[in-house]
Amino acid sequence: KVAKQEGYVAPEAYGKQSLIPDDFSDVGEARTFVEQYADEVAFTVATDYLRYNGTYWEESEHAVTLAMMEHTDVQLAEAEKQVEAALQNLEHLGIPREAAKTGGKKFRDSLDEAQTAAYQQYQYYSTFQAFVMKYRNVRNMTNALDAAKPIVLHNPEALDSNPMLLNTPGGTYYLPEGLNGWKPTDPADLLTKVTTVV
C-alpha cells in the first residue's frame, strides 16, 4: 500500500537524489551538504561553525570542513557508481565505452532515440562527477561552506538557552524531574557544554 502512494520514495533511492545538487553551484552544493548534515552542523555569528559530536555542539571549523570532505566522499562514490551504470547501459545499447567517453557531434548524430537518452544520462552523471571533483578542492569547499552558513544559522542566544537541561556524557537531564528527567542527547537542544561524569 505505502509503495503505491503518491510521493513514495523507495529505500534504495532515498537520499540518492539529495546528493546531487539542483544546480551545480556553490549554493547547490551547500544545500546538499546541509540536507545530509543538518543535525550535525550549525553556525552562529558569535561562534562561527559548530559540529555536533554526538554529545554536544563544539566550535570547530575543522570538524565542519571534515564533514564537507565526508560529504564529497559519498558524492564521489555515488557519481562513480552512476557513471559506471550509465556506461554499462550504453554498452548494452551497442555503444562502445570509449566512443561514449570521447563523444563529439558526429557521435551524437549517429545515436538513435534510446541511445541518445542513455548518452544524456551518462553526460549528466559525468558532469556531476566533475562537479564533485571540483568541490574536493579546498578553495571550492570553502565557498560551499560559506554558502551554507545562512542555511544553518542560529541565534547565539539559542545555544545553551535552557538552564534546566544538564548535559552529561550519558544523556541529558531535565533538572526539575531529577533522575527521571533523563533523555538521550538531542542536537536540537543546542547544548555546547557537557559534564565530565554521567
Positions of PLM-derived features:
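Repeat-associated, polar segments at repeat-unit boundaries in modular proteins
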Residues: 1-13
